[in-house]
Amino acid sequence: MTTIAVVGATGQVGQVMRTLLEERNFPADTVRFFASPRSAGRKIEFRGTEIEVEDITQATEESLKDIDVALFSAGGTASKQYAPLFAAAGATVVDNSSAWRKDDEVPLIVSEVNPSDKDSLVKGIIANPNCTTMAAMPVLKPLHDAAGLVKLHVSSYQAVSGSGLAGVETLAKQVAAVGDHNVEFVHDGQAADAGDVGPYVSPIAYNVLPFAGNLVDDGTFETDEEQKLRNESRKILGLPDLKVSGTCVRVPVFTGHTLTIHAEFDKAITVEQAQEILGAASGVKLVDVPTPLAAAGIDESLVGRIRQDSTVDDNRGLVLVVSGDNLRKGAALNTIQIAELLVK
């Protein structure tokens, strides 16, 4: 008998988790949903029955003892507070926030890349990577295995759903506020008032913001999104000295993160070799032109526009474009795939 819990079940990613649990016929005999007091008591239909959402603030170690796996997508603060409680009760926690990713005693797993790290549990917690890192890893791991990755230069173009419901609502409201005046931006960027900037530094509608995430106060002038890309790539690939430079950009797209990747390798690797490798890679779909709209709603990372990097000698560099659904594989799906590894 397997019992699974979804913490943050009523949120944006939690909703996708619930859908995927049903779609994939996850082998759980009992499912429990948890959320904040605001959503507690709400009834959610799941597999033909209604399940009442439980108040996470009322959870005790005793009340959680039947749970085998707990899927967390309730934010870092809630994860720090409640994930250890679930683990102490005997559950293995798979956490979607950034709370545990840098902890040396918590494995950071992409199911297609480093699944065996699930056997290295110390705290009973497994971390899910950031959605931008997630899109890149299934693509980069097989290329690394073939040629030895040594350096990455990445620009990411991240959808507003990566900022949560606030990001989605802000873009929708700004587009509506500008209305038919949008073409006036051709000649004047101040021609129309988009209204409240929401979680962003400037209007996101009809704009591109080269500032995704929050500025890290460490003198690097990087955002936390850019540092996550570096730190998480190193940890997942087992390359602590990997050189990674990234610029994370927020774009007016609802779902789907896109990355342009300049990858340098220790050994030569041609475009044809890369295409053959990626065509056979798990969690990857080779396409001509990856786009966020094409990626939205599918499981795989789309990869295309593969070229030789002319700035790297001896055919040791590749340029490629990756698009991935930041809510699906970038958050919910990988969490569930890890849980599937745990209950096999």
Curated annotation (Swiss-Prot):
Binding site for NADP(+): T10, G11, Q12, V13, R38, S39, S161, G162, N326
GO molecular function, one term: protein dimerization activity
Catalytic residues identified in the record: C131 (acyl-thioester intermediate), H257 (proton acceptor)
EC number(s) stated in the UniProt entry for this protein: 1.2.1.11
Keywords: Amino-acid biosynthesis, Diaminopimelate biosynthesis, Lysine biosynthesis, Methionine biosynthesis, NADP, Oxidoreductase, Threonine biosynthesis
Matches recorded under InterPro entries: Asp-semialdehyde_DH_CS, Asp_semialdehyde_DH, Asp_semialdehyde_DH_beta, NAD(P)-bd_dom_sf, Semialdehyde_DH_NAD-bd, Semialdhyde_DH_dimer_dom
GO BP field: 'de novo' L-methionine biosynthetic process; diaminopimelate biosynthetic process; isoleucine biosynthetic process; lysine biosynthetic process via diaminopimelate; threonine biosynthetic process
Residues reported in the UniProt entry to bind phosphate: R101, K228
Stored SMART domains: Semialdhyde_dh (SM00859)
Record-listed substrate binding positions: Q158, R250
Pathway entry: Amino-acid biosynthesis; L-lysine biosynthesis via DAP pathway; (S)-tetrahydrodipicolinate from L-aspartate: step 2/4; Amino-acid biosynthesis; L-methionine biosynthesis via de novo pathway; L-homoserine from L-aspartate: step 2/3; Amino-acid biosynthesis; L-threonine biosynthesis; L-threonine from L-aspartate: step 2/5
Catalysed reactions, semicolon-separated: L-aspartate 4-semialdehyde + phosphate + NADP(+) = 4-phospho-L-aspartate + NADPH + H(+)
SUBUNIT field: Homodimer.
Family according to the record: Belongs to the aspartate-semialdehyde dehydrogenase family.
Role of this protein: Catalyzes the NADPH-dependent formation of L-aspartate-semialdehyde (L-ASA) by the reductive dephosphorylation of L-aspartyl-4-phosphate.
Stored PANTHER family: ASPARTATE-SEMIALDEHYDE DEHYDROGENASE, DEHYDROGENASE, PUTATIVE-RELATED
The name this protein goes by in its record: Aspartate-semialdehyde dehydrogenase
Organism annotation: Corynebacterium melassecola
Gene: asd
